[in-house]
Every structure is written in C-alpha cells, then in structure tokens.
C-alpha cells in the first residue's frame, strides 16, 4: 500500500534494469493506471519528471517528481509467457513480469485479466518514423531513480523485468523506498 502523499522511489541499483509498475486505487480496484489516458492528458508518449500517471477514470494517481534517467515506456504491455513465444520465438517456458504482477497482486483480489499496461520504468523503447518499435538497452546507470508521489491511496505492483531484450541481456534487482 502507498498512501496519498507518500512517495515511492524506484532505484536501478546496477544500471540497465527495467521495472514494470502497475497501480490500482486501494478503495476501488476497478480504477487502475491507464497508458491511454496518461498519454492523452500529458500530450506525450515520453512520460518523465513533471508528468502525472492517470487512471482509467481520468484521475491523477501519481506525479513524477524526479527522474534522473528520463527514459520510460508506456507503450508495451508487461512481458508474459506469450511474449517470449510469439515475439521472441522462444518455445520454452520463461518467467515474466505479467506472472510476477498477477501472482503477487492476487492477495488484493486482483485477477490476471485486470493487469493493465505497465509503466515501464527505465525501459528504452524507440520508434521509427514508420511507427515500428524497437526495444533498446536501457540508458539508466547505477543509482538512477524515479521519485513518484501518490495522489490517492494505491495498491502498487512493481517487478524487475525478466525480458532479456529489455535489460541488455542481464537481470539485476530493482530497489524501492517508500517515503512517508
């Protein structure tokens, strides 16, 4: 739980590690983070310091107070077993952000189908003039962080991304701090 006015600091301890984050209103879990509303109301796909993360009900959920890296993604869904099968042509089982999120959020009554598009902290998604997307290595360095302030009481799901392509083919921990 993150209460209104609390701050959440997400830290890339070693550099080049993405963290997927989803948000739910703590009093009504049907209200959740929305990539579409956020990009609409912030008028950009490059969400960083000074921007807000908006809900599917057009209400501010968080504000980004600081962002030492400045590159995050809100276009791509959390990686799932299907991501590895379809996109990366990996027929073997692979752990995923989607599974990490729904498994750990189930204690709050959140089902897999309720997991929204995550705010992908430190993820470096590039887009060509023709619209083609590519996932490049994160630009984050050891110690980079994003500081958020909760605008309502929130259930926060946070995971270190397990997709090789998103993390320059290495997996590292993500640290977080809650500041009251």
Language model features with spans:
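Acidic, Ser/Thr/Pro
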Residues: 1-180
């Amino acid at each position: 739980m993150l209460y209104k006015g609390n701050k959440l600091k997400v830290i890339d301890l070693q550099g080049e590690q993405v963290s997927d984050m989803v948000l739910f209103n703590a009093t009504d879990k049907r209200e959740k983070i929305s990539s579409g509303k956020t990009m609409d109301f912030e008028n950009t796909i490059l969400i960083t310091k000074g921007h807000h993360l908006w809900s599917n009900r057009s209400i501010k959920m968080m504000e980004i107070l600081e962002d030492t890296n400045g590159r995050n993604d809100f276009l791509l869904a959390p990686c799932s077993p299907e991501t590895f099968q379809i996109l990366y042509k990996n027929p073997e089982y692979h752990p995923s952000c989607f599974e990490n999120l729904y498994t750990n959020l189930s204690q709050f009554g959140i089902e897999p189908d309720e997991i929204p598009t995550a705010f992908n902290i430190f993820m470096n998604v590039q887009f060509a003039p023709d619209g083609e997307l590519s996932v490049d290595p994160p630009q984050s360095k050891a110690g980079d962080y994003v500081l958020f302030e909760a605008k309502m009481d929130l259930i926060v799901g946070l995971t270190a991304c397990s997709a090789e392509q998103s993390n320059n083919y290495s997996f590292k921990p993500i640290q977080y701090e809650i500041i009251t």
